[in-house]
């Protein structure tokens, strides 16, 4: 996709600003101990790169895969990015968060059916989009990416990035994760990924009071509308 006149908006849900029902959903995923810190690590640190991954696919992949496959790919990009640029302590904490969350979801798939197979079969139906089932699918995608530990170069090639220019490895340290940190994480990640050869337009972020609303959208900068 041509970047001219376009931008990426990454929308992130706020912790504790939703309804009691929405907030209770968060607590059920992350547990009652250090819930806010776990939420911020997952959504303010990890998931913003996941969402940026959708932007990478939109502007670099000539033929985007099925949404199920793209979800797996963008998690592999996010994990690969933080394995290359992240603090090991945060990667380990992410793994613990995902393991705990998976223990709380009820598996909707029959025995022997993978999360990818199940999602392919049910994509576009209410079966996928209820909270338990989509959460189970998404956390399995993250877990699979953590197990694969794919290198960043391969993850970007898989996303359709051409003429990759491998960059020096370094550690991006974010000692405190707050709403104000999110734009810094996104801007640093976008800068580094462009150095790798990734085609990206401007990337913006916004927040939503629903703690479960996390997504990325392509914006027409002339009309202000979503594409």
Language-model segments: residues:
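Active-site scaffold of zinc-dependent metalloenzymes
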Residues: 1-40, 55
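Soluble non-cytosolic domains of exported or imported proteins
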Residues: 35-43, 47, 64, 68
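Amphipathic repeat-derived elements
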Residues: 43, 49-57, 205, 209-213
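Active-site recognition of the HExxH zinc-binding catalytic motif
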Residues: 46-59, 71, 75, 79
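Hydrophobic alpha-helical membrane-insertion segments
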Residues: 59-63, 84
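Glycine- and acidic-residue-rich phosphate-binding/metal-coordinating active-site segment common to enzymes
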Residues: 67-90
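Long, well-structured alpha-helical subdomains associated
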Residues: 85-210, 222
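Alpha-helical solenoid repeat scaffolds
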Residues: 212-227
């Amino acid at each position: 996709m041509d970047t001219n006149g376009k931008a990426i908006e990454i929308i992130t849900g706020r912790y504790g600003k939703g309804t009691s029902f929405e907030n209770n959903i968060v607590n059920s995923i992350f547990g009652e101990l250090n819930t806010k810190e776990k939420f911020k690590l997952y959504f303010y640190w990890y998931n913003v790169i996941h969402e940026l991954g959708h932007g990478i696919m939109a502007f670099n992949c000539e033929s985007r895969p099925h949404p199920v496959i793209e979800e797996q790919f963008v998690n592999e990009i996010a994990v690969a990015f933080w394995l290359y640029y992240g603090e090991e302590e945060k990667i380990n904490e992410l793994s613990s968060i995902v393991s705990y969350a998976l223990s709380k979801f009820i598996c909707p798939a029959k025995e022997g059916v993978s999360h990818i197979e199940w999602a392919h079969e049910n994509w576009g139906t209410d079966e996928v989009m209820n909270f338990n089932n989509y959460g189970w699918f998404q956390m399995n995608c993250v877990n699979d990416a953590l197990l694969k530990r794919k290198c960043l170069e391969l993850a970007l090639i898989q996303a359709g990035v051409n003429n990759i220019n491998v960059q020096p490895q370094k550690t991006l340290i974010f000692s405190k994760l707050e709403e104000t940190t999110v734009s810094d994480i996104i801007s640093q990640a976008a800068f580094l990924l462009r150095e790798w050869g990734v085609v990206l337009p401007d990337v913006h972020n916004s927040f939503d009071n629903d703690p479960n609303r996390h997504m990325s959208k392509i914006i027409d900068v002339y009309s202000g509308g979503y594409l």
